[in-house]
Swiss-Prot record:
Protein name: Ribosomal RNA small subunit methyltransferase H
Family stated for the protein in its record: Belongs to the methyltransferase superfamily. RsmH family.
SUPFAM superfamilies (alphabetical): Putative methyltransferase TM0872, insert domain (SSF81799), S-adenosyl-L-methionine-dependent methyltransferases (SSF53335)
Pfam families the record matches: Methyltransf_5 (PF01795)
Positions with a binding annotation for S-adenosyl-L-methionine: 33-35, 52, 79, 100, 107
Record-level Gene Ontology MF annotations: rRNA (cytosine-N4-)-methyltransferase activity
Amino acid sequence: MEVLHKPVLLRESVEFLTENGGKIYVDCTLGGGGHAKEILKKRKDIFLIGIDRDEEAIEIAKENLKEFEGRFSIYKANFKDLDLVLKEEGIDKVDGFLFDLGVSMYQLKGERGFTFQEDQPLDMRMDKEQTLTACKVVNNYPERELIRILKEYGEEKFAVRIAKAIVQRRKKKPIETTGELVDVILSVVPEYYKHGKIHPATRTFQAIRIEVNKELESLKEALEKTPYHFNSKGRLVVITFHSLEDRIVKHFIKEKEKEGIFRIITKKPVTPSEEEIRENPASRSAKLRVAEKI
């Protein structure tokens, strides 16, 4: 699949990660290898461990990192299992973990239901081997559970209306494509909501994607494991794309600072420049936070 994915805050994240002069880094969201490539270019003695749940992205990354053969290992895994990956690699301590959260262009451009711009099967799985899909969430979850997900993970103010409409529609026939789900959403949200800054389906799609992939649980679990695997001055670098992720990261690094485990490097999150947002509108909501192991 020839899709060019533009890594967000690339220069800033790689600089923060590698400026400690370390030798072993973990890219917990390898994707197509955009960040990994820049990390490996930094110094010839760097070894990189890449983790991703997405088989297609891994194949693209292998191709993109060919010139660094022998200087990286790639694992198909959920980043919450980073401790198991390190054990398998025979490494206990590393100099940095990078997390670039959210959906990659490879997933948005594939026929996997991550986008509402095209009519695709309702899937949304980052790991195609897992059984829970967006279709199952939309057609099988009880109304109260749909409301909870839309409120909690989508921060959707019309969660009740949308959930009720989904339940009504699926009684007639299952909702099987992204287009059908968008139609349901558009049928119940007020007119003004259709002309806002973001598409009225954005929050619903985000909420369902987070539920399908258990994104927030995985993030919390992964972050909690990182302090046990840092060398001194190891860096934690995290790029988030919505307030739910950012809150989790902010809370985690503040807690670890209180416990005397981390020093916070970015007092305020780093955000993309106007130029980057112009070139890559998908970067507009990105926030970068960095902490260092004491």
